[in-house]
């Protein structure tokens, strides 16, 4: 399904890797970003693991740490860290997202062009 506009910039699609299980502790998603697309600022109570399955992307946090990622890379985002992730301007990116501890907490603000450009 297409991701909601209020939490993303650009075209993003996502879907579960497995059917939801009542009271499941693990949330698994496949997320596909079009070139330049990205999440808004958000955090996960118990952190997040991203595995890049295809393309090139960026993962950054509020303190200015930023890493460019490519297919085969894994990124571990610490619990509670406010961050964003998405595709580079010239490539699609698909990652697998693994989280526990409940839903994503959106910060209510999108990543501006200056933060996106680094």
What are these regions (language model features)?
Residues 22, 58, 66, 70-71, ...:
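Ligand-binding loop in jelly-roll beta-barrel domains
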Residues 13-16, 27-44, 79:
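Conserved short histidine dyad/triad with adjacent acidic residue
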Residues 29-31, 50, 96:
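Conserved hydrophobic/aromatic positions in well-ordered beta-strands
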Residues 1-26, 105-118:
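A short, N-terminal "cap"/entry segment at the start of jelly-roll beta-barrel domains
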Residues 10-13, 24-29, 46-48, 55, ...:
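A generic structural signal for short beta-strands and their flanking turns/coil linkers
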Residues 38, 43-71, 81:
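A short beta-strand-loop-beta hairpin characteristic of the jelly-roll/cupin
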